[in-house]
Protein backbone atom coordinates (compact mmCIF):
# COMPACT_ATOMS: atom_id res chain seq x y z
CA UNK A 1 0.00 0.00 0.00
CA UNK A 2 1.14 3.53 -0.74
CA UNK A 3 0.95 6.24 1.88
CA UNK A 4 -2.14 7.61 0.12
CA UNK A 5 -3.76 4.16 0.25
CA UNK A 6 -3.09 3.91 3.97
CA UNK A 7 -4.61 7.33 4.60
CA UNK A 8 -7.60 6.40 2.46
CA UNK A 9 -8.11 3.21 4.47
CA UNK A 10 -8.03 5.10 7.75
CA UNK A 11 -10.42 7.72 6.38
CA UNK A 12 -12.86 5.08 5.13
CA UNK A 13 -12.90 3.32 8.49
CA UNK A 14 -13.38 6.62 10.31
CA UNK A 15 -16.23 7.49 7.93
CA UNK A 16 -18.08 4.25 8.72
CA UNK A 17 -17.57 4.80 12.44
CA UNK A 18 -18.61 8.45 12.28
CA UNK A 19 -21.67 7.90 10.09
CA UNK A 20 -23.05 5.09 12.24
CA UNK A 21 -22.44 7.00 15.46
CA UNK A 22 -24.02 10.15 14.04
CA UNK A 23 -27.11 8.21 12.96
CA UNK A 24 -27.41 6.70 16.43
CA UNK A 25 -27.25 10.10 18.12
CA UNK A 26 -29.41 11.89 15.54
CA UNK A 27 -32.31 9.51 16.17
CA UNK A 28 -32.74 11.02 19.63
CA UNK A 29 -33.07 7.60 21.18
CA UNK A 30 -32.88 3.88 20.55
CA UNK A 31 -35.88 1.84 19.43
CA UNK A 32 -35.31 -1.86 20.15
CA UNK A 33 -37.90 -4.32 18.88
CA UNK A 34 -36.72 -7.59 20.43
CA UNK A 35 -34.58 -9.24 23.11
CA UNK A 36 -36.00 -7.25 26.02
CA UNK A 37 -34.75 -9.75 28.58
CA UNK A 38 -31.16 -9.47 27.40
CA UNK A 39 -31.50 -5.70 27.15
CA UNK A 40 -32.70 -5.35 30.74
CA UNK A 41 -29.89 -7.68 31.83
CA UNK A 42 -27.43 -5.34 30.12
CA UNK A 43 -29.02 -2.28 31.74
CA UNK A 44 -28.67 -3.85 35.19
CA UNK A 45 -24.97 -4.56 34.69
CA UNK A 46 -24.30 -1.10 33.26
CA UNK A 47 -25.99 0.59 36.21
CA UNK A 48 -24.00 -1.59 38.62
CA UNK A 49 -20.72 -0.62 36.95
CA UNK A 50 -21.68 3.03 36.62
CA UNK A 51 -22.25 3.05 40.39
CA UNK A 52 -18.74 1.69 40.96
CA UNK A 53 -19.53 -2.01 41.38
CA UNK A 54 -17.20 -4.63 39.93
CA UNK A 55 -18.45 -7.73 38.14
CA UNK A 56 -17.72 -10.94 40.08
CA UNK A 57 -16.91 -9.00 43.24
CA UNK A 58 -20.23 -7.18 43.67
CA UNK A 59 -22.52 -9.23 41.45
CA UNK A 60 -22.37 -12.56 39.65
CA UNK A 61 -21.87 -12.77 35.88
CA UNK A 62 -19.72 -14.80 33.49
CA UNK A 63 -19.14 -11.68 31.41
CA UNK A 64 -15.94 -9.73 31.90
CA UNK A 65 -15.59 -6.19 33.18
CA UNK A 66 -15.15 -4.73 29.68
CA UNK A 67 -18.31 -6.34 28.29
CA UNK A 68 -20.36 -3.30 29.34
CA UNK A 69 -17.76 -0.85 30.70
CA UNK A 70 -17.76 1.51 27.66
CA UNK A 71 -21.49 2.12 28.09
CA UNK A 72 -21.19 2.37 31.87
CA UNK A 73 -18.51 5.05 31.47
CA UNK A 74 -20.88 7.41 29.68
CA UNK A 75 -23.78 6.63 32.02
CA UNK A 76 -21.48 7.57 34.88
CA UNK A 77 -20.64 10.82 33.07
CA UNK A 78 -24.34 11.72 33.13
CA UNK A 79 -25.52 10.80 29.63
CA UNK A 80 -28.98 9.28 29.12
CA UNK A 81 -28.79 5.55 28.61
CA UNK A 82 -29.48 5.53 24.87
CA UNK A 83 -26.87 8.21 24.26
CA UNK A 84 -24.39 6.37 26.48
CA UNK A 85 -24.94 3.19 24.47
CA UNK A 86 -24.12 4.92 21.17
CA UNK A 87 -21.14 6.78 22.62
CA UNK A 88 -19.84 3.62 24.29
CA UNK A 89 -19.95 1.78 20.98
CA UNK A 90 -18.22 4.70 19.28
CA UNK A 91 -15.49 4.49 21.91
CA UNK A 92 -15.03 0.79 21.16
CA UNK A 93 -14.79 1.55 17.45
CA UNK A 94 -12.28 4.33 18.03
CA UNK A 95 -10.16 2.01 20.18
CA UNK A 96 -10.28 -0.72 17.53
CA UNK A 97 -9.58 1.53 14.56
CA UNK A 98 -5.75 1.80 14.89
CA UNK A 99 -5.33 -1.94 15.47
CA UNK A 100 -7.68 -2.90 12.64
CA UNK A 101 -6.00 -0.36 10.34
CA UNK A 102 -2.57 -1.83 11.10
CA UNK A 103 -3.77 -5.38 10.49
CA UNK A 104 -5.58 -4.44 7.27
CA UNK A 105 -2.83 -2.41 5.62
CA UNK A 106 -0.02 -4.79 6.62
CA UNK A 107 -1.78 -8.08 5.80
CA UNK A 108 -4.38 -7.40 3.11
CA UNK A 109 -4.52 -6.10 -0.44
CA UNK A 110 -6.34 -2.82 -0.97
CA UNK A 111 -9.92 -3.95 -1.73
CA UNK A 112 -9.97 -6.51 1.07
CA UNK A 113 -8.29 -4.14 3.48
CA UNK A 114 -11.20 -1.73 3.02
CA UNK A 115 -13.79 -4.52 3.35
CA UNK A 116 -12.10 -5.78 6.50
CA UNK A 117 -11.79 -2.30 8.04
CA UNK A 118 -15.42 -1.46 7.32
CA UNK A 119 -16.55 -4.82 8.73
CA UNK A 120 -14.66 -4.26 11.97
CA UNK A 121 -16.21 -0.82 12.39
CA UNK A 122 -19.69 -2.25 11.75
CA UNK A 123 -19.14 -4.91 14.39
CA UNK A 124 -18.26 -2.16 16.84
CA UNK A 125 -21.20 0.18 16.27
CA UNK A 126 -24.14 -1.84 14.87
CA UNK A 127 -27.50 -1.84 16.62
CA UNK A 128 -28.22 -5.52 16.05
CA UNK A 129 -26.43 -8.42 17.77
CA UNK A 130 -24.49 -9.78 14.72
CA UNK A 131 -27.49 -11.66 13.37
CA UNK A 132 -29.39 -11.49 10.10
CA UNK A 133 -32.55 -10.26 11.85
CA UNK A 134 -33.21 -6.63 10.87
CA UNK A 135 -34.99 -5.55 14.08
CA UNK A 136 -33.08 -3.22 16.38
CA UNK A 137 -31.74 -4.95 19.48
CA UNK A 138 -29.52 -3.65 22.27
CA UNK A 139 -28.54 -7.11 23.47
CA UNK A 140 -25.21 -8.93 23.25
CA UNK A 141 -23.18 -5.98 21.97
CA UNK A 142 -20.20 -7.57 23.70
CA UNK A 143 -20.36 -10.47 21.22
CA UNK A 144 -19.94 -8.08 18.29
CA UNK A 145 -17.04 -6.32 19.97
CA UNK A 146 -15.36 -9.62 20.77
CA UNK A 147 -15.77 -10.86 17.20
CA UNK A 148 -14.13 -7.66 15.95
CA UNK A 149 -11.16 -8.05 18.30
CA UNK A 150 -10.85 -11.76 17.49
CA UNK A 151 -10.75 -11.05 13.75
CA UNK A 152 -7.98 -8.47 14.17
CA UNK A 153 -5.96 -10.94 16.24
CA UNK A 154 -6.51 -13.77 13.73
CA UNK A 155 -5.55 -11.66 10.72
CA UNK A 156 -2.28 -10.72 12.42
CA UNK A 157 -1.59 -14.28 13.56
CA UNK A 158 -2.61 -16.22 10.45
CA UNK A 159 -1.72 -14.06 7.44
CA UNK A 160 1.86 -13.06 6.58
CA UNK A 161 2.90 -9.45 7.04
CA UNK A 162 4.51 -7.21 4.46
CA UNK A 163 6.90 -5.66 6.94
CA UNK A 164 9.86 -7.54 8.34
CA UNK A 165 12.06 -6.62 11.24
CA UNK A 166 11.87 -6.39 14.97
CA UNK A 167 9.68 -3.28 15.16
CA UNK A 168 6.94 -4.83 13.04
CA UNK A 169 7.00 -8.05 15.08
CA UNK A 170 6.80 -6.11 18.33
CA UNK A 171 3.88 -4.05 16.98
CA UNK A 172 2.06 -7.21 15.93
CA UNK A 173 2.72 -8.79 19.32
CA UNK A 174 1.57 -5.74 21.24
CA UNK A 175 -1.71 -5.58 19.31
CA UNK A 176 -2.31 -9.30 19.74
CA UNK A 177 -1.49 -9.09 23.45
CA UNK A 178 -3.90 -6.21 23.97
CA UNK A 179 -6.51 -8.07 21.95
CA UNK A 180 -6.16 -11.23 24.02
CA UNK A 181 -6.39 -9.24 27.24
CA UNK A 182 -9.52 -7.47 25.98
CA UNK A 183 -11.12 -10.80 25.04
CA UNK A 184 -10.38 -12.16 28.52
CA UNK A 185 -12.13 -9.13 30.00
CA UNK A 186 -15.13 -9.27 27.65
CA UNK A 187 -16.05 -12.94 27.19
CA UNK A 188 -13.72 -15.78 27.98
CA UNK A 189 -14.87 -18.09 25.17
CA UNK A 190 -13.28 -15.77 22.60
CA UNK A 191 -9.97 -15.91 24.44
CA UNK A 192 -10.12 -19.71 24.36
CA UNK A 193 -10.58 -19.49 20.58
CA UNK A 194 -7.70 -17.07 20.03
CA UNK A 195 -4.89 -18.29 22.30
CA UNK A 196 -4.04 -21.58 20.50
CA UNK A 197 -3.79 -19.81 17.13
CA UNK A 198 -1.58 -17.00 18.44
CA UNK A 199 0.65 -19.44 20.31
CA UNK A 200 1.05 -21.69 17.26
CA UNK A 201 1.74 -18.73 14.97
CA UNK A 202 4.50 -17.43 17.24
CA UNK A 203 5.95 -20.93 17.58
CA UNK A 204 6.02 -21.55 13.83
CA UNK A 205 7.68 -18.19 13.22
CA UNK A 206 10.03 -18.63 16.19
CA UNK A 207 9.13 -15.03 16.94
CA UNK A 208 10.66 -14.37 20.34
CA UNK A 209 10.19 -10.60 20.14
CA UNK A 210 6.52 -10.99 19.21
CA UNK A 211 5.96 -13.48 22.00
CA UNK A 212 7.52 -11.15 24.54
CA UNK A 213 5.32 -8.31 23.28
CA UNK A 214 2.20 -10.48 23.59
CA UNK A 215 3.09 -11.52 27.12
CA UNK A 216 4.18 -8.04 28.15
CA UNK A 217 1.03 -6.24 27.02
CA UNK A 218 -1.29 -8.99 28.22
CA UNK A 219 0.29 -9.16 31.65
CA UNK A 220 0.36 -5.37 31.81
CA UNK A 221 -3.41 -5.23 31.37
CA UNK A 222 -3.87 -7.95 34.00
CA UNK A 223 -1.68 -5.99 36.41
CA UNK A 224 -3.68 -2.80 35.80
CA UNK A 225 -6.96 -4.61 36.53
CA UNK A 226 -5.46 -6.19 39.64
CA UNK A 227 -4.34 -2.79 40.93
CA UNK A 228 -7.81 -1.33 40.27
CA UNK A 229 -9.96 -4.18 41.60
CA UNK A 230 -7.63 -6.18 43.83
CA UNK A 231 -6.28 -9.71 43.40
CA UNK A 232 -9.61 -11.14 44.53
CA UNK A 233 -11.09 -10.06 41.20
CA UNK A 234 -9.48 -12.93 39.32
CA UNK A 235 -10.51 -15.50 41.92
CA UNK A 236 -14.09 -14.22 41.81
CA UNK A 237 -14.06 -14.19 37.98
CA UNK A 238 -12.88 -17.79 37.92
CA UNK A 239 -15.55 -18.70 40.46
CA UNK A 240 -18.30 -17.22 38.28
CA UNK A 241 -16.98 -19.02 35.19
CA UNK A 242 -16.82 -22.35 37.01
CA UNK A 243 -20.32 -21.86 38.42
CA UNK A 244 -21.68 -21.26 34.92
CA UNK A 245 -19.74 -24.21 33.48
CA UNK A 246 -21.20 -26.56 36.09
CA UNK A 247 -24.81 -25.45 35.81
CA UNK A 248 -27.44 -27.26 33.80
CA UNK A 249 -29.68 -24.18 33.70
CA UNK A 250 -28.31 -23.08 30.34
CA UNK A 251 -25.54 -25.40 29.12
CA UNK A 252 -25.72 -23.85 25.65
CA UNK A 253 -28.04 -21.14 24.31
CA UNK A 254 -28.99 -22.64 20.95
CA UNK A 255 -28.25 -25.61 18.73
CA UNK A 256 -26.03 -28.52 19.69
CA UNK A 257 -22.41 -28.42 18.56
CA UNK A 258 -23.12 -31.12 15.97
CA UNK A 259 -25.95 -29.03 14.49
CA UNK A 260 -23.77 -25.92 14.47
CA UNK A 261 -21.18 -27.78 12.38
CA UNK A 262 -23.33 -30.03 10.20
CA UNK A 263 -26.88 -28.69 10.42
CA UNK A 264 -28.60 -26.96 7.50
CA UNK A 265 -27.34 -23.52 8.56
CA UNK A 266 -23.78 -24.58 9.33
CA UNK A 267 -22.72 -27.31 6.93
CA UNK A 268 -21.92 -24.97 4.02
CA UNK A 269 -19.61 -22.86 6.17
CA UNK A 270 -17.91 -25.96 7.56
CA UNK A 271 -17.28 -27.27 4.05
CA UNK A 272 -15.91 -23.91 2.93
CA UNK A 273 -13.51 -23.81 5.87
CA UNK A 274 -12.06 -27.22 5.10
CA UNK A 275 -11.90 -26.31 1.42
CA UNK A 276 -9.91 -23.19 2.31
CA UNK A 277 -7.50 -25.23 4.44
CA UNK A 278 -6.98 -27.77 1.65
CA UNK A 279 -6.58 -25.17 -1.09
CA UNK A 280 -4.19 -23.07 0.98
CA UNK A 281 -1.94 -26.07 1.50
CA UNK A 282 -2.17 -27.08 -2.18
CA UNK A 283 -1.05 -23.59 -3.14
CA UNK A 284 2.02 -23.88 -0.95
CA UNK A 285 0.67 -21.82 1.95
CA UNK A 286 1.26 -24.58 4.48
CA UNK A 287 1.59 -22.24 7.45
CA UNK A 288 -1.61 -20.34 6.69
CA UNK A 289 -3.55 -23.55 6.09
CA UNK A 290 -2.35 -25.04 9.36
CA UNK A 291 -3.22 -21.91 11.33
CA UNK A 292 -6.70 -21.73 9.80
CA UNK A 293 -7.22 -25.36 10.75
CA UNK A 294 -6.05 -24.55 14.29
CA UNK A 295 -8.57 -21.69 14.44
CA UNK A 296 -11.50 -23.87 13.36
CA UNK A 297 -12.33 -25.50 16.74
CA UNK A 298 -12.33 -22.14 18.52
CA UNK A 299 -14.51 -20.48 15.90
CA UNK A 300 -16.98 -23.36 16.09
CA UNK A 301 -16.99 -23.25 19.89
CA UNK A 302 -17.70 -19.51 20.03
CA UNK A 303 -20.53 -19.91 17.52
CA UNK A 304 -21.95 -22.81 19.54
CA UNK A 305 -21.86 -20.77 22.77
CA UNK A 306 -23.46 -17.65 21.26
CA UNK A 307 -27.21 -17.12 21.15
CA UNK A 308 -28.50 -17.71 17.62
CA UNK A 309 -25.38 -19.63 16.52
CA UNK A 310 -24.79 -17.14 13.71
CA UNK A 311 -21.59 -17.97 11.76
CA UNK A 312 -20.03 -14.52 11.97
CA UNK A 313 -16.60 -16.16 11.54
CA UNK A 314 -17.35 -16.57 7.82
CA UNK A 315 -16.33 -12.92 7.44
CA UNK A 316 -12.78 -13.80 8.50
CA UNK A 317 -12.80 -16.91 6.30
CA UNK A 318 -13.79 -14.85 3.27
CA UNK A 319 -11.04 -12.30 3.88
CA UNK A 320 -8.52 -15.11 4.44
CA UNK A 321 -9.32 -16.96 1.21
CA UNK A 322 -9.57 -13.88 -1.00
CA UNK A 323 -6.28 -12.55 0.33
CA UNK A 324 -4.46 -15.81 -0.43
CA UNK A 325 -5.99 -16.15 -3.89
CA UNK A 326 -4.61 -12.72 -4.79
CA UNK A 327 -1.05 -13.69 -3.84
CA UNK A 328 1.18 -13.86 -6.94
CA UNK A 329 2.65 -17.15 -8.05
CA UNK A 330 0.27 -19.37 -6.11
CA UNK A 331 -1.77 -22.25 -7.46
CA UNK A 332 -5.35 -23.08 -6.49
CA UNK A 333 -6.17 -19.37 -6.74
CA UNK A 334 -9.50 -19.89 -8.47
CA UNK A 335 -10.64 -22.35 -5.82
CA UNK A 336 -9.66 -19.95 -3.05
CA UNK A 337 -11.53 -17.15 -4.80
CA UNK A 338 -14.69 -19.26 -5.02
CA UNK A 339 -14.29 -20.25 -1.37
CA UNK A 340 -13.79 -16.65 -0.25
CA UNK A 341 -16.72 -15.30 -2.20
CA UNK A 342 -18.88 -18.16 -0.97
CA UNK A 343 -18.04 -17.30 2.64
CA UNK A 344 -18.81 -13.60 2.13
CA UNK A 345 -22.11 -14.41 0.41
CA UNK A 346 -23.14 -16.62 3.33
CA UNK A 347 -22.27 -13.94 5.90
CA UNK A 348 -23.69 -11.07 3.81
CA UNK A 349 -27.14 -11.02 5.52
CA UNK A 350 -25.43 -10.43 8.88
CA UNK A 351 -23.23 -7.68 7.45
CA UNK A 352 -26.18 -6.01 5.72
CA UNK A 353 -28.30 -6.12 8.88
CA UNK A 354 -25.47 -4.49 10.85
CA UNK A 355 -24.88 -1.83 8.19
CA UNK A 356 -28.58 -0.96 7.97
CA UNK A 357 -29.24 -0.92 11.70
CA UNK A 358 -28.28 2.73 12.45
CA UNK A 359 -30.50 3.88 9.56
CA UNK A 360 -33.36 1.62 10.65
CA UNK A 361 -33.12 3.08 14.13
CA UNK A 362 -33.07 6.61 12.69
CA UNK A 363 -36.26 5.92 10.73
CA UNK A 364 -37.93 4.34 13.76
CA UNK A 365 -37.97 7.64 15.66
CA UNK A 366 -41.30 8.56 14.06
CA UNK A 367 -42.96 5.51 15.61
CA UNK A 368 -45.28 6.15 18.56
CA UNK A 369 -42.92 4.59 21.10
CA UNK A 370 -42.85 4.84 24.89
CA UNK A 371 -39.99 4.89 27.37
CA UNK A 372 -38.74 1.56 28.66
CA UNK A 373 -36.89 2.83 31.73
CA UNK A 374 -37.96 5.36 34.37
CA UNK A 375 -36.97 8.89 33.42
CA UNK A 376 -36.05 10.10 29.95
CA UNK A 377 -33.34 7.52 29.16
CA UNK A 378 -34.09 7.42 25.44
CA UNK A 379 -34.77 3.68 25.10
CA UNK A 380 -38.23 3.37 23.59
CA UNK A 381 -40.42 0.54 22.36
CA UNK A 382 -43.85 0.12 20.81
CA UNK A 383 -46.60 0.31 23.45
CA UNK A 384 -47.97 -3.12 22.56
CA UNK A 385 -44.52 -4.67 22.96
CA UNK A 386 -44.39 -3.34 26.52
CA UNK A 387 -47.97 -3.62 27.70
CA UNK A 388 -49.17 -6.79 25.98
CA UNK A 389 -48.05 -9.54 28.35
CA UNK A 390 -48.24 -13.00 26.82
CA UNK A 391 -47.86 -16.19 28.83
CA UNK A 392 -47.96 -19.92 28.20
CA UNK A 393 -49.46 -22.41 30.64
CA UNK A 394 -48.63 -26.11 30.50
CA UNK A 395 -51.64 -28.24 31.45
CA UNK A 396 -52.92 -31.73 30.67
CA UNK A 397 -55.93 -32.22 28.46
CA UNK A 398 -59.14 -33.37 30.09
CA UNK A 399 -58.89 -36.52 27.98
CA UNK A 400 -55.91 -38.59 26.96
CA UNK A 401 -54.33 -39.40 30.31
CA UNK A 402 -54.18 -43.05 29.30
CA UNK A 403 -51.53 -42.30 26.67
CA UNK A 404 -49.04 -41.04 29.23
CA UNK A 405 -49.75 -37.36 28.84
CA UNK A 406 -49.35 -36.72 32.54
CA UNK A 407 -45.81 -38.15 32.57
CA UNK A 408 -44.71 -35.56 29.99
CA UNK A 409 -45.94 -32.60 32.02
CA UNK A 410 -43.38 -30.45 33.87
CA UNK A 411 -42.98 -31.21 37.54
CA UNK A 412 -45.17 -29.01 39.73
CA UNK A 413 -43.46 -26.28 41.72
CA UNK A 414 -44.53 -26.28 45.35
CA UNK A 415 -44.54 -23.15 47.48
CA UNK A 416 -45.42 -23.68 51.13
CA UNK A 417 -46.87 -27.02 50.07
CA UNK A 418 -49.21 -25.50 47.46
CA UNK A 419 -48.51 -25.90 43.71
CA UNK A 420 -47.73 -22.91 41.51
CA UNK A 421 -49.21 -22.81 38.04
CA UNK A 422 -46.70 -23.94 35.35
CA UNK A 423 -46.91 -20.55 33.63
CA UNK A 424 -44.15 -19.13 31.44
CA UNK A 425 -43.73 -15.44 30.58
CA UNK A 426 -43.29 -15.07 26.82
CA UNK A 427 -43.49 -11.36 26.01
CA UNK A 428 -44.30 -8.04 27.60
CA UNK A 429 -41.37 -8.40 30.00
CA UNK A 430 -40.94 -4.66 30.49
CA UNK A 431 -44.60 -4.18 31.39
CA UNK A 432 -44.53 -7.20 33.70
CA UNK A 433 -41.42 -6.10 35.59
CA UNK A 434 -42.68 -2.53 35.90
CA UNK A 435 -46.17 -3.48 37.12
CA UNK A 436 -44.96 -6.03 39.66
CA UNK A 437 -42.21 -3.75 40.98
CA UNK A 438 -44.58 -0.81 41.39
CA UNK A 439 -47.15 -3.02 43.11
CA UNK A 440 -44.56 -4.30 45.60
CA UNK A 441 -43.60 -0.71 46.39
CA UNK A 442 -47.21 0.43 46.72
CA UNK A 443 -47.88 -2.43 49.14
CA UNK A 444 -45.28 -1.05 51.55
CA UNK A 445 -42.38 -3.38 50.76
CA UNK A 446 -40.39 -1.01 48.57
CA UNK A 447 -36.70 -0.26 48.94
CA UNK A 448 -35.78 -3.69 50.31
CA UNK A 449 -33.37 -6.06 48.52
CA UNK A 450 -35.22 -8.93 46.87
CA UNK A 451 -34.09 -12.36 45.71
CA UNK A 452 -36.13 -13.18 42.60
CA UNK A 453 -37.04 -16.82 41.98
CA UNK A 454 -36.54 -16.63 38.22
CA UNK A 455 -33.82 -16.37 35.58
CA UNK A 456 -34.38 -12.62 35.11
CA UNK A 457 -34.42 -10.19 38.01
CA UNK A 458 -34.89 -6.74 36.47
CA UNK A 459 -37.62 -5.62 38.91
CA UNK A 460 -35.24 -3.25 40.70
CA UNK A 461 -34.89 -1.13 37.53
CA UNK A 462 -38.42 0.18 38.08
CA UNK A 463 -38.04 1.46 41.61
CA UNK A 464 -40.30 -0.76 43.67
CA UNK A 465 -37.56 -2.94 45.13
CA UNK A 466 -33.85 -2.49 45.75
CA UNK A 467 -31.08 -4.31 43.86
CA UNK A 468 -29.73 -7.40 45.59
CA UNK A 469 -26.06 -6.99 46.63
CA UNK A 470 -24.08 -9.93 45.33
CA UNK A 471 -26.98 -11.10 43.19
CA UNK A 472 -27.01 -12.26 39.58
CA UNK A 473 -28.74 -10.15 36.89
CA UNK A 474 -29.03 -13.39 34.91
CA UNK A 475 -29.41 -16.55 36.98
CA UNK A 476 -27.04 -19.46 36.34
CA UNK A 477 -27.35 -21.45 39.54
CA UNK A 478 -26.94 -21.41 43.31
CA UNK A 479 -28.30 -18.66 45.54
CA UNK A 480 -26.13 -15.62 44.73
CA UNK A 481 -26.83 -12.70 47.08
CA UNK A 482 -29.17 -14.64 49.36
CA UNK A 483 -27.32 -13.42 52.47
CA UNK A 484 -28.40 -9.84 51.71
CA UNK A 485 -31.99 -10.64 50.72
CA UNK A 486 -34.84 -9.38 52.89
CA UNK A 487 -37.58 -10.62 50.58
CA UNK A 488 -38.12 -13.39 48.04
CA UNK A 489 -40.27 -12.57 45.01
CA UNK A 490 -41.86 -15.57 43.32
CA UNK A 491 -43.55 -14.63 40.01
CA UNK A 492 -46.74 -16.51 39.25
CA UNK A 493 -45.53 -16.52 35.62
CA UNK A 494 -41.77 -16.91 35.32
CA UNK A 495 -39.42 -16.40 32.40
CA UNK A 496 -38.13 -19.86 33.30
CA UNK A 497 -40.49 -21.89 35.53
CA UNK A 498 -37.79 -24.55 35.96
CA UNK A 499 -35.44 -21.92 37.39
CA UNK A 500 -38.19 -20.76 39.75
CA UNK A 501 -38.55 -24.34 40.97
CA UNK A 502 -34.78 -24.76 41.32
CA UNK A 503 -34.36 -21.61 43.44
CA UNK A 504 -37.24 -22.52 45.76
CA UNK A 505 -35.84 -26.02 46.13
CA UNK A 506 -32.37 -24.67 46.99
CA UNK A 507 -33.84 -22.28 49.55
CA UNK A 508 -35.67 -25.18 51.17
CA UNK A 509 -32.59 -27.41 51.17
CA UNK A 510 -30.48 -24.61 52.67
CA UNK A 511 -32.93 -24.33 55.57
CA UNK A 512 -34.22 -20.81 54.94
CA UNK A 513 -37.55 -20.00 56.53
CA UNK A 514 -39.99 -18.34 54.12
CA UNK A 515 -43.05 -16.47 55.34
CA UNK A 516 -45.76 -15.34 52.95
CA UNK A 517 -46.30 -11.58 53.12
CA UNK A 518 -48.38 -10.88 50.03
CA UNK A 519 -50.03 -12.91 47.26
CA UNK A 520 -51.49 -11.54 44.03
CA UNK A 521 -52.37 -13.16 40.70
CA UNK A 522 -48.96 -11.98 39.45
CA UNK A 523 -46.56 -12.80 42.29
CA UNK A 524 -46.04 -14.11 45.80
CA UNK A 525 -43.85 -12.06 48.15
CA UNK A 526 -42.09 -13.88 50.97
CA UNK A 527 -40.04 -12.83 53.94
CA UNK A 528 -36.80 -14.77 54.31
CA UNK A 529 -34.92 -15.73 57.44
CA UNK A 530 -32.24 -18.33 58.12
CA UNK A 531 -33.07 -21.38 60.16
CA UNK A 532 -31.57 -21.75 63.60
CA UNK A 533 -28.92 -24.06 62.16
CA UNK A 534 -28.04 -21.72 59.29
CA UNK A 535 -24.63 -20.00 59.43
CA UNK A 536 -26.14 -16.78 58.15
Feature map (PLM): residue ranges:
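Start-transfer (signal-anchor) and selected internal transmembrane alpha helices
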Residues: 1-23, 112-115
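Transmembrane catalytic cores of multi-pass membrane glycosyltransferases
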Residues: 20-41, 47-51, 55-66, 80-87, ...
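Transmembrane-helix motifs of polytopic, lipid-linked glycan transferases
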Residues: 87-115, 123-124
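Membrane-interface micro-motifs in multi-pass membrane enzymes
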Residues: 122-158, 259-267
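Hydrophobic/aromatic-rich transmembrane helices and adjacent perimembrane loops
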Residues: 146-149, 304-372
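Short hydrophobic alpha-helices at membrane interfaces in multi-pass membrane enzymes
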Residues: 156-181, 210-216, 287-295
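Membrane-interface alpha helices of multi-pass inner-membrane proteins
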Residues: 169-188, 194-199, 220-223, 295-305
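Extracytoplasmic
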Residues: 352-532
Amino acid sequence: MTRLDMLGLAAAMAAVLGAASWAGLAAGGLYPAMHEGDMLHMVQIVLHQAAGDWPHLDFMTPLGVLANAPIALFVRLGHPFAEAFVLGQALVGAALLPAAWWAAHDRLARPWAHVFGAGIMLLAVALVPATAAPEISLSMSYNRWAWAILFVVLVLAVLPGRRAGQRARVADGAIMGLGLAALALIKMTYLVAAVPVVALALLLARDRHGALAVLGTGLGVMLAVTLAAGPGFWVAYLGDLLAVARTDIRPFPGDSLLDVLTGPRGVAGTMLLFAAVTLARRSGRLREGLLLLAAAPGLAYVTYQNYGNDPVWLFFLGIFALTLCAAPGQGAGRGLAVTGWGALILVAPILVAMAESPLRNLMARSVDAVEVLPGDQGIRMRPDRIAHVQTRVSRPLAAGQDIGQGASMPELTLLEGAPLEPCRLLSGLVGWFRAVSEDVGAAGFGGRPVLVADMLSAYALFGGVAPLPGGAPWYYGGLPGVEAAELVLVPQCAARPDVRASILRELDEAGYVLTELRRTPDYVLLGIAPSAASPR
